[in-house]
UniProtKB/Swiss-Prot annotation:
Protein name (Swiss-Prot/TrEMBL): Metacaspase-3
A GO term from the CC aspect: recycling endosome
Compartments where found: Recycling endosome
Residue numbers binding Ca(2+): 183, 199-200, 230
Function, as annotated: Cysteine protease that cleaves specifically after arginine or lysine residues. In the bloodstream form, may cleave inactive metacaspase-4 MCA4 prior to MCA4 secretion.
């Protein structure tokens, strides 16, 4: 599918008067201003990290008791439903691991969700860019753990949750609590002092208390992110990773079932790195400047297509990266065997393919 950059530019630049209010930030406008901030985005692999300390999930839940977010924009609410979102972008300023585009990724995702009218009641923004509009706090290990627990705190059937991470992803030797040789990790801004956060702990923080009929969408734009949420089902294609053969969902692990309806799109497979974009205007997302390739593709797909199926969203994201000569292959995993012909939605529960056990 050819993406017309003018289409998305028009969408981003046409701002509804009802989309912002006094005391809120207009992220669509901010996303447009990225046209003026072009700079290189250099990705460095962190290499194998030492196993970090385990996260005390009960303590994290207690610590999240008084945490709260802010309403980022005004939109028509979902009756009887709460919509929460957690955005994390880390550039690691002043360190040997420095990146340039991860905070821009958060701006681009916020702009996309605002333009689509997702009625977020509470948003938390953890970024290490001091002048980032609406920033909640620094993306330290303690803060990320606390606000992951906050995201799902008191969630009830019908609620809608959204999670976006852009930063370093890496691996560490497994702590021995799984059959895998390596754990996938995300790297907080203070990872060199406090350690990373492994996939096992991400799974427990987000899913151990998640009830049925809660919808959670997650985007991880980082290296080694294919199975970073340890979800039981993944998208597979009979024609291979890059092909568009017969797609279906497949169970890949037992014992990690999740009650809620959770879907994750990752920037790449576990063994891959998630590439950079030096000039994001080449993706037609209405912005330039540094940014993650997967974030730019996903936001472009969401803004240019109103009725993509789950399967088409992933295939066209992969195809766009392939056309731009990136080698990474985004992955889709879920808590249930999604009917891949179902129209993609950030708020609706899944239709399940009952043929997949």
């Amino acid at each position: 599918m050819a993406v017309d950059p003018r289409c998305l530019l028009s969408l981003c630049s046409t701002i509804s008067k009802a989309s912002s209010a006094k005391g809120t930030n207009d992220f669509v406008k901010i996303g447009m201003e990225l046209w003026q901030t072009a700079q290189p985005y250099l990705v460095q692999a962190l290499g194998l990290q030492p196993p970090p300390p385990k996260v005390d999930v009960d303590a994290a839940v207690a610590n999240a008791g008084d945490a709260h977010g802010e309403q980022p924009w005004v939109a028509t609410p979902l009756p009887g439903q709460t919509v929460r979102a957690l955005f994390i972008g880390i550039n690691y300023y002043g360190t040997s691991a420095a990146l340039s585009g991860c905070c821009n990724d958060v701006k681009q995702m916020l702009a996309t969700l605002q333009k689509k009218g997702l009625p977020i009641n509470e948003a938390v923004i953890l970024v290490d860019e001091d002048n980032f509009p609406g920033r909640t706090d620094q993306p330290t290990r303690d803060n990320i753990v606390r606000y992951m627990a906050w995201l799902v705190k008191d969630a009830k059937p019908g609620d809608v949750l959204f999670f976006h991470y852009s930063g370093h992803g890496t691996q560490c030797k497994s702590r021995g609590d799984s059959d895998e040789k390596y754990d996938q990790c995300i790297a907080p801004v203070d990872f060199q002092k406090s350690g990373c956060i492994v996939d096992d702990d991400i799974h427990k923080l987000l899913f151990s208390r998640l009830p049925e009929k809660v919808r959670l969408t997650a985007v991880f734009d980082c290296c080694h992110s294919g199975s970073i949420m340890d979800l039981p089902f993944t998208y597979v294609c009979s024609g291979g990773e890059q092909a568009s053969g017969t797609p279906h969902m497949k169970r890949i692990r037992e014992g990690n079932d999740v009650l809620g309806d959770v879907m994750m799109i990752s920037g790449c497979a576990d063994e891959q790195t998630s590439a950079d974009v030096k000039n994001t205007a080449t993706f037609g997302t209405g912005s330039t400047g540094a940014g993650g390739a997967a974030t730019q593709c996903i936001t472009c797909m969401l803004m240019n297509n109103q009725s993509l199926s789950y399967g088409k969203l992933l295939i066209e994201t992969r195809d766009m990266l392939k056309r731009k000569r990136f080698k990474q292959v985004p992955q889709l995993s879920a808590s249930k065997a999604i009917d891949l012909d179902q129209t993609f939605s950030l708020t609706e529960m899944f239709s399940v393919d009952r043929s997949v056990q």
